């Protein structure tokens, strides 16, 4: 079997181009501008970079990007209230709470509060249940990306 080198940067660039076209199509045909809300609690350096890059990529694709940076000492109830607010916000189509969250918060409770239809990580039990059952559903980004790259090569 021959070895092939996968150029992930080139693949990602082409994928972002296709996404931008799809977003423009939504805007022109349906007057919809997708919106991604990202919530970061605390100031973990790796999470800061991830959130910053996610915002840049979202905007470059022509989508609305909403960032909510909450202090480390934010209560779990306040974070859950923010998630509820985003669940009902019609301009937000997807919600990503950046993990890990501070130790005083229960990650699973936060995951379950996000509406399955807005859970871009695919971690809600409804979404992961569909995936585990072999039913069509949202696949988390990292495995989807790895699978997509490997199938094209």
Can you describe what each PLM-predicted range is?
Residues 2-28:
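Positively charged, low-complexity intrinsically disordered leader regions
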Residues 15, 44-52:
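A structural motif shared across PLP-dependent enzymes of the aminotransferase-like
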Residues 22, 49-61:
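Short, solvent-exposed amphipathic alpha-helices that sit
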Residues 25-33, 85-90:
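Glycine-rich phosphate/diphosphate-binding loops that line cofactor/substrate pockets in enzymes
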Residues 33-43:
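Short beta-strand segments enriched in small/hydrophobic residues
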Residues 62-64, 68-139:
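Phosphate/diphosphate ligand-binding glycine-rich loop within oxidoreductases
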Residues 151-153:
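Conserved small/polar residues in nucleotide/adenosyl-binding loops
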């Amino acid at each position: 079997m021959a070895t092939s080198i996968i150029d992930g940067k080139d693949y990602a660039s082409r994928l972002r181009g296709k996404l931008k076209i799809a977003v423009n199509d939504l805007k022109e045909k349906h007057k919809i501008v997708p919106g991604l809300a990202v919530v970061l609690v605390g100031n973990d350096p790796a999470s800061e970079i991830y959130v910053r890059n996610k915002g840049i990529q979202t905007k470059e694709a022509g989508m609305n990007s909403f960032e909510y940076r909450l202090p480390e000492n934010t209560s779990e109830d306040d974070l859950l209230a923010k998630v509820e607010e985003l669940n009902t916000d019609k301009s937000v189509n997807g919600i990503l709470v950046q993990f890990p969250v501070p130790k005083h918060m229960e990650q699973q409770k936060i995951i379950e509060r996000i509406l399955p239809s807005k859970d871009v990580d695919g971690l809600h039990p409804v979404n992961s249940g569909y995936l585990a059952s072999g039913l069509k559903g949202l696949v988390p980004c990292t495995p989807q990306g790895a699978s997509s790259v490997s199938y094209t090569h």
